């Protein structure tokens, strides 16, 4: 299962002509959050941020922090160009983390230098940044590599297997591709005919609530649009979003309950049936395995040798 976080690489920097940093970051946040909402019928906004207002605030926060990051080669004017590019991006590009070329810049920091954002680095990637105050400039994990602590390359997603609690960089399957528990499909497609031991095939998904569905023979339902195939009614139903402490997973009536601005956790790690834990606030306690996670863009930085830590907001220290 994917936690469905789309990582937006912020490459803002100081300087530029005409537009202010505040205006550029407001416009970028608006473009990104509008795309997040329109590509998911609002479901991705609720899942990651809880509300559009919080999406705008937290996305802008990422941008304004990056303005002060050393080594960043971009300008507020460039962020305006990036905002326009995100407005014209396809939903597949957005949901698969395929950042527009107009949003990518190479910074001045060499490999190995401390960083928080890819735009600081000559490689345009900041690695090992997920569970630390500072990462280091370098290259992202290879396809199939572990992404527990590093973001994947553009065009790849970090897939979480809730059975093994591992995180791997993958590319979702196109129409007709083999699919299964650890091989999901592109947005707009559903995995049909898969079992616990046998893969199925990616097929076009139904895109509206109330449409007929069948996970064995097709069509399935578009999960990226917040839909779930209720096997009891054989129709696509809208995913429900629950608050902290509520049960998550498939209900007795066959509907699916996910977590609003949070993640579903079992006794150990993430799961598809468990209890919701809302993402923790900046500075609050977190746990990289048992939750809660932190409110984006904060990172859970664990104490040495443990999984328990504190939600750290980038910009608290200079990297």
Regions inferred by a protein language model and the residue ranges of each:
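Bacterial signal peptide processing site
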Residues: 15-17
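Short N-proximal segments of mature Sec-exported proteins
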Residues: 22-57, 61-62
């Amino acid at each position: 299962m994917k936690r469905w976080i789309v990582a937006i690489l912020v490459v803002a920097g100081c300087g530029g002509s005409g537009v202010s940093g505040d205006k550029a970051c407001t416009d970028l946040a608006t473009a990104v959050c509008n795309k997040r909402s329109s590509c998911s019928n609002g479901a991705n906004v609720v899942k990651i941020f809880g509300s559009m207002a919080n999406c705008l605030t937290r996305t802008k926060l990422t941008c304004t922090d990056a303005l002060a990051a050393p080594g960043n080669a971009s300008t507020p004017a460039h962020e305006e160009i990036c905002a326009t590019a995100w407005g014209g991006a396809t939903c597949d590009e957005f949901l698969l983390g395929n950042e527009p070329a107009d949003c990518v810049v190479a910074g001045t920091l060499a490999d190995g230098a401390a960083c928080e954002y890819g735009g600081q680095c000559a490689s345009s990637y900041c690695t090992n940044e997920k569970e630390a105050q500072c990462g280091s400039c370098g290259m992202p994990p290879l396809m199939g590599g572990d992404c527990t602590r590093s973001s994947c390359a553009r065009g790849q997603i970090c897939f979480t297997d809730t059975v093994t609690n591992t995180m791997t960089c993958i590319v979702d399957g196109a129409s007709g591709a083999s699919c299964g528990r650890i091989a999901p499909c592109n947005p707009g497609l559903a995995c049909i005919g898969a079992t616990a031991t046998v893969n199925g095939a990616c097929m076009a998904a139904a895109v509206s609530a109330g449409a007929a569905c069948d996970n064995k023979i097709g069509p399935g339902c578009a999960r990226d649009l917040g839909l779930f195939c209720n096997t009891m009614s054989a129709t696509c139903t809208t995913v429900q979003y629950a608050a902290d402490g509520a049960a998550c997973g498939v209900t007795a009536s066959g509907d699916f309950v996910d977590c609003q601005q949070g993640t579903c956790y079992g006794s150990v790690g993430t799961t598809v049936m468990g209890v919701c834990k809302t993402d923790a606030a900046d500075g609050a306690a977190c746990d990289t395995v048992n939750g809660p996670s932190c409110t984006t863009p904060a990172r859970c930085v664990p104490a040495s040798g443990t999984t328990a830590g504190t939600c750290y907001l980038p910009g608290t220290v200079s990297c």
